[in-house]
Regions:
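Conserved catalytic or regulatory cores that recognize and/or transform ribose-phosphate-containing ligands
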Residues: 1-169
Length: 169
């Protein structure tokens, strides 16, 4: 079942990109899931995987603050999930094409990260799916996520009521 929820995936580490998103979502009473918690344990992975598989909107900013190998892999898994014919979820992706100065100091990791980012970005540009969005800034990501959430909220009762062929939405 798709949850009427925005999943705040993507760059973790010490990143604070989620803070303005959560503040805005709270002010608009938008449900969200934040996988970046202080006391994360392996047991948290079950809830995180559930949200990644079922939230109606998934955000994936891949920022310059980490090498992002895990986030890039999650983008791939999520794309596969959203390309299913019966999936009514939306995926919003932002991939920066650079790294912070600090991360550039490790030339091998930096080179691999930049290569992976470029490849994933180019593959995403080729995907023909109406529910995969590529944005250039966090502001665009926030604005689009709010609009998509409003659309999901409006259409949800009608899908449940009038379309018996869709899985529970």
């Amino acid at each position: 079942m798709n949850k009427l929820c925005v999943g705040l995936f993507g760059t973790c580490g010490n990143s604070t990109w989620r803070n303005p998103f959560m503040e805005k979502y709270k002010s608009l009473e938008i449900n969200f899931y934040n996988p970046q918690i202080e006391d994360w344990t392996p047991e948290c992975s079950k809830e995180e995987a559930e949200h990644l598989a079922s939230d109606c909107i998934i955000l994936f900013p891949v920022l310059d603050e980490t090498y992002a190998f895990g986030s890039l892999a999650e983008v791939g898994f999520s794309i596969l999930q959203t390309l299913r014919l019966d999936d009514k979820r939306d995926l919003i992706v932002l991939i920066t094409d650079h790294l912070s100065e600090e991360l550039m100091k490790d030339e091998i990791q930096a080179k691999e990260s930049l290569k992976s980012r470029a490849l994933v970005y180019q593959h995403l540009k080729k995907i023909r799916s109406p529910n995969v969005y590529l944005v250039n800034t966090l502001d665009e990501m926030l604005d689009l996520s709010i609009k998509l959430y409003e659309n999901h909220k409006r259409i949800r009762p009608f899908r449940k009521r009038f379309n018996p062929h869709l899985r529970e939405y």
